[in-house]
């Protein structure tokens, strides 16, 4: 694992006291990290591009909503670890081109895509993943009309400027759009230099993957492969049965498989005599699927963490 310091610590400011409301000034196709709650909460990637970590609490459960733009990696972790509640910040380091967070209580360093502590008091430990999903804002609002959305935190961020010094944030800007369109991947590719090689032809390095882990087992579900399977895949990960849905409007979602045979019906799925919403796991008759604790990330980041064999194949 290659670790390097690329910007000063906290040059990208984490959010410690998030506020929420019902209004979001962005576009309907803007992606948000959605976390269940009463009411559900949405964290727009347009804001997370400039902050990368939001320290929050949901129903008394301290959580960290985390985002690494270079790895396309969205994951929500529990902040209660080792008998204390941790507060996370952005270390300014990358590990295999992935965000390295640090906790302000022990200054231990944590790899964002895996949740593993790579240096410090908790080295070798792994944070607990919380159920979450990444979906377009339009899908979140349609599925959760009672939901709330993170309001603009404001301030300065290194991601807002051209150098290493923080600059005033303009949330109307999208600093990673050009990177997402390039063939290369990783930190150097962000600056237009492709120094890493990708030796697979079956999927691209920045293919979106839904990562599911169960015990020591890990399986990544590439978005186009699930869509190519009529939008639904049912398989086992470790000792747990999983069902993964993917649609054009709602994105990719993973749930515990109840054992039904799902069939695509437009943007929904039919099983056991009723229709199921893939974005929420809710059925028309009131039943609800159990959302799995998953990550959303690019294929290269999943492969960095789990190896080339850790992908579902049709």
Tell me the role of every PLM-derived stretch.
Residues 1-314:
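Mid-to-C-terminal functional-domain signal that highlights helix-capping/loop sites
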């Amino acid at each position: 694992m290659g670790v390097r310091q690329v910007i000063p610590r906290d040059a990208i400011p984490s959010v410690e006291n998030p506020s929420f409301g019902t209004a979001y000034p962005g576009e309907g196709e803007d992606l948000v990290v959605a976390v269940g709650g009463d009411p559900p909460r949405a964290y727009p990637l347009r804001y997370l591009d400039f902050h990368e970590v939001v320290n929050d609490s949901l129903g008394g459960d301290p959580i960290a909503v985390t985002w690494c733009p270079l790895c396309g990696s969205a994951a929500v972790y529990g902040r209660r670890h080792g008998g204390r509640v941790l507060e996370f910040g952005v270390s300014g380091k990358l590990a295999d081109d992935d965000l390295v967070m640090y906790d302000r209580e022990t200054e231990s360093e944590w790899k964002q895509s895996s949740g593993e502590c790579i240096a410090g008091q908790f080295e070798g430990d792994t944070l607990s993943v919380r159920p979450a999903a990444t979906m377009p804002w339009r899908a979140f609002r349609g599925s959760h009309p009672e939901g709330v959305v993170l309001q603009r935190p404001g301030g300065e961020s290194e991601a807002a400027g051209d150098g290493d010094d923080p600059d005033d944030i303009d949330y109307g800007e999208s600093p990673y759009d050009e990177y997402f369109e390039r063939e290369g991947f990783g930190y150097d590719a962000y600056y237009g230099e492709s120094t890493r090689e990708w030796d697979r032809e079956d999927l691209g390095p920045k293919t979106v993957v839904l990562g599911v882990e169960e015990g020591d087992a890990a399986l990544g579900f590439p978005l186009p492969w699930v869509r190519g399977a009529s939008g639904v895949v049912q398989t086992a990960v470790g000792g747990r049965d999983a069902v993964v849905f993917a649609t054009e409007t709602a994105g990719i979602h993973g749930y515990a498989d109840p054992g039904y045979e799902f069939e695509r019906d437009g943007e929904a799925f039919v099983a056991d005599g009723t229709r199921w919403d893939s974005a929420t796991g809710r059925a028309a008759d009131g039943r609800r699927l159990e959302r799995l604790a998953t990550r959303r990330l690019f294929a290269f980041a999943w492969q960095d963490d789990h190896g080339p064999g850790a992908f579902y194949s049709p």
